[in-house]
Structure formats: C-alpha cells, structure tokens
Amino acid sequence: MAFVSMKELLEDAKREQYAIGQFNINGLQWTKAILQAAQKEQSPVIAAASDRLVDYLGGFKTIAAMVGALIEDMAITVPVVLHLDHGSSAERCRQAIDAGFSSVMIDGSHQPIDENIAMTKEVTDYAAKHGVSVEAEVGTVGGMEDGLVGGVRYADITECERIVKETNIDALAAALGSVHGKYQGEPNLGFKEMEAISRMTDIPLVLHGASGIPQDQIKKAITLGHAKININTECMVAWTDETRRMFQENSDLYEPRGYLTPGIEAVEETVRSKMREFGSAGKAAKQQVG
C-alpha cells in the first residue's frame, strides 16, 4: 500500500470538523503500535519522523522502507501518511520526498517571514511535482522539540496570510500558545487569534504541542479549523511510565520483549484514545485503500 498525501484527508477533516492525529515514530515497535491503533480504530493516521531523529532511526530510506513493510505485513488498510516533522531545510525535505515520504513540514518559523516564505516556496514547488503535501509554520511553539528549546511567539495573521497565498501550502501550523513537551501550568491557547487566522487563510490548521491540552480546548481548536493535531509527549510518557514500572516490579527482567511490550501497548492505547478524542475513529472508510 502506498503512503497517501494528507491534503485531501485534512480538507475532509476540516470540513467535517474532526482532526487527524500525527504520532511521532521512535522505532519499529513504536510504529507497529501506531499502525495497529489506526487499524483497530479505523482511523486515518499521520506517522511522523522528526527531522532531528531521522538519522537515529536509520535515515529517510530506512524509515520509508520500514513503515511501508509494516503496512504490508500487518495488512493495514487505513490511509497512512508518512510525514517529515520539523524539516530543517529545503534539502532535507527533498531527501524525504525522494525517499518516499508522502508529506513534509518545512519549519522556517525561526527565520524572518521573507526567508520562511522563500524556503517554503522552494519545498512546495518540488513537492507538487511528486504529489506530496506540505505543512509550514508561522510563529514559534514553545518548549523543547527533540533538543531544540524555544519560547512562544504568536503567529502574526498577516504573515499567515502571506505564506498561504505565496507558497500554496496544504496546512499551516500557526503558533498560538501551545508548547512542545510537558506544560508548566494550564495550557492557554489563543482562540481569538485562532479564529481570525482560520477565517483569513481558509486552509487546515495544525496544532503542535497538543500533549496535555485539556479535551475541551482540543475540541474548540477543531471547531476553529484545526484538522491535524500532533501528539508525541503523551505517548513517550505512557511508554516510559510502563517501562519504569516493569523494572521496578521485575528487577531481574532482562529480555527486551518482556520489558518493552507493556510500554508499546501503552502507546497503542494512548493513540487509540486520541483518535477517539479527535473524532477520526471510523473515518477511514471514507478514503479506504489497500
């Protein structure tokens, strides 16, 4: 089964007011858990490799081959997007596309808007030739993303309008108060700004740093145009908690399958729960493949 672009998936999600989850992969077993959760929930899914973890995971070609083989061997029939998360340059995005990724995010959010737009346009021009969807970011999401620490900088509505019109991206991550990693205190999303940006750009929005955001805020973000929601920290915490518990209760355990399996099962349950929360469960039949 070939990977699919997220363009049509997100357009349907935005129109029907649900969201598709992006879940970051951290290895083969982790990927299996995400795919199995999607199949059980009959939900489309976005499996993402963060640029900063690509080499750790074996490189773009290895990742694409691994995920593709798992889809085939596990008889996965739901739509699967293979996405590059936080692509650091146009060249990295090209490498991902050439390796078979069906979607990329170019993250020029730490650059001045003119440079961000130029970098993004370079990616969208190349991606369009290969049927690959493109996500871009304006403003900066706070917290830590795979070692990159930053503060929150709200997206400027004029900059959002410019990048959408000048680059023809398929989805926009507009930073509006979310953070990567664990929240210190109650999350406080900028719903007023969110509504204005959604109305002005009229394309699917992406919520980064969604782990730990209360369900009522998630649902409100979906009604205001967010069709893609990124989850990573909650999965990592679920895995770590279960793995730590296994060692605490079984100090003599040394077989990897014995101590890794409970954590992977916790990841699967977390993903399934998020798919139900986002409203994507049962939506795979609309674009069934296989």
UniProtKB/Swiss-Prot annotation:
Pfam families reported in the protein's UniProt record: F_bP_aldolase
Active-site residues, as the UniProt record annotates them: 85 (proton donor)
Residue numbers binding dihydroxyacetone phosphate: 181, 209-211, 230-233
Catalytic activity: 6-phospho-5-dehydro-2-deoxy-D-gluconate = 3-oxopropanoate + dihydroxyacetone phosphate
Positions that bind Zn(2+): 86, 180, 208
One GO BP annotation of this record: glycolytic process
Function: Produces dihydroxyacetone phosphate (DHAP or glycerone phosphate) and malonic semialdehyde (MSA or 3-oxopropanoate) from 6-phospho-5-dehydro-2-deoxy-D-gluconate (DKGP).
Protein name per Swiss-Prot or TrEMBL: 6-phospho-5-dehydro-2-deoxy-D-gluconate aldolase
